[in-house]
């Protein structure tokens, strides 16, 4: 009999404990309305040289989307449990996520001055019939391009050939002085008694200076 009472008491305690920790799940969907921010940023770049000046203006629009930082769930569900020994209530949990999305749109505006292009092509006037090897040459101008802001420089090349020139040079030598050295070696030869002949052995050295 005592064992039956103890078993019944344990069974009642176990059912009470299980009732305390039992719960239910309720699904709830909440739509969050996002907000956005539009931030324009303008940038201007300029270019200038001797004949041209223009500006490049660009505007970048940045759009940021933001979800709400808080959410309210109105249909909160609760579940009441009761047993012989305990009772409780269940409060559902809610979560939300914040998402930020940026959209960049670029607009490029390029403004240039109006320009007019001219492309003439003609033959240059012939040169005069003077002593020149190029008198029959045909010189054609390069294509030209000009704008309202200035002209484009044009380069022409002309080949000139010189006539051969002959020059005569007269060379007059300076007056020169020549010296002659005579060296004699006297000797006496007797051909016969009473006759004596004299003669010289002479060498001439000629030196010339300019």
UniProtKB/Swiss-Prot annotation:
Q: Which residues form the signal peptide?
A: 1-19
The record lists glycosylation at 23, 174, 200, 206
Q: Which UniProt keywords apply?
A: Cell wall, Cell wall biogenesis/degradation, Glycoprotein, Secreted, Signal
- List, as start-end ranges, the regions of compositional bias called Low complexity: 118-127
Coiled-coil intervals, chain numbering: none
Q: Where in the cell is it found?
A: Secreted, Cell wall; Cell surface
- Entry's Gene Ontology cellular component terms: cell periphery; cell surface; cellular bud tip; cytoplasm; extracellular region; fungal-type cell wall; fungal-type vacuole
Please note every region of biased composition (Basic and acidic residues). 132-141
Q: Is Phosphoprotein among this UniProt entry's keywords?
A: no
Q: Where is this region: Disordered?
A: 80-99, 118-142
Alphabetically, which GO biological process terms does the record hold? fungal-type cell wall organization; nucleobase-containing compound metabolic process
Where primarily located?
secreted
What is this protein's function? Answer: Required to stabilize the cell wall in the absence of multiple GPI-anchored mannoproteins.
Specify the protein name.
Answer: Cell wall protein SRL1
Q: Which organism is it from?
A: Saccharomyces cerevisiae (strain ATCC 204508 / S288c) (Baker's yeast)
């Amino acid at each position: 009999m005592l064992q039956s009472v103890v078993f019944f008491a344990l069974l009642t305690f176990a059912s009470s404990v299980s009732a305390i920790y039992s719960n239910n799940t309720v699904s709830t969907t909440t739509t969050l309305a996002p907000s956005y921010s539009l931030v324009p940023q303008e940038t201007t770049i300029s270019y200038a040289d001797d004949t041209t000046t223009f500006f490049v203006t660009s505007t970048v629009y940045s759009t940021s989307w933001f979800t709400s930082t808080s959410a309210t769930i109105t249909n909160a569900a609760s579940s009441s449990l009761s047993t012989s020994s305990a009772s409780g209530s269940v409060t559902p949990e809610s979560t939300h996520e914040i998402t930020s999305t940026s959209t960049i749109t670029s607009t490029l505006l390029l403004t240039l001055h109006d320009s007019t292009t001219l492309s003439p092509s003609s033959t240059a006037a012939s040169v005069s019939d003077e002593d020149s090897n190029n008198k029959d040459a045909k010189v054609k101008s390069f294509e030209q391009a000009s704008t309202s802001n200035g002209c484009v420089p044009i380069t022409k090349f002309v080949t000139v050939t010189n006539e051969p020139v002959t020059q005569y040079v007269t060379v007059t030598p300076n007056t020169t002085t020549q010296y002659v050295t005579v060296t004699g070696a006297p000797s006496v030869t007797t051909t016969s008694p009473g006759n004596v002949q004299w003669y010289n052995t002479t060498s001439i050295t000629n030196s010339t200076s300019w």
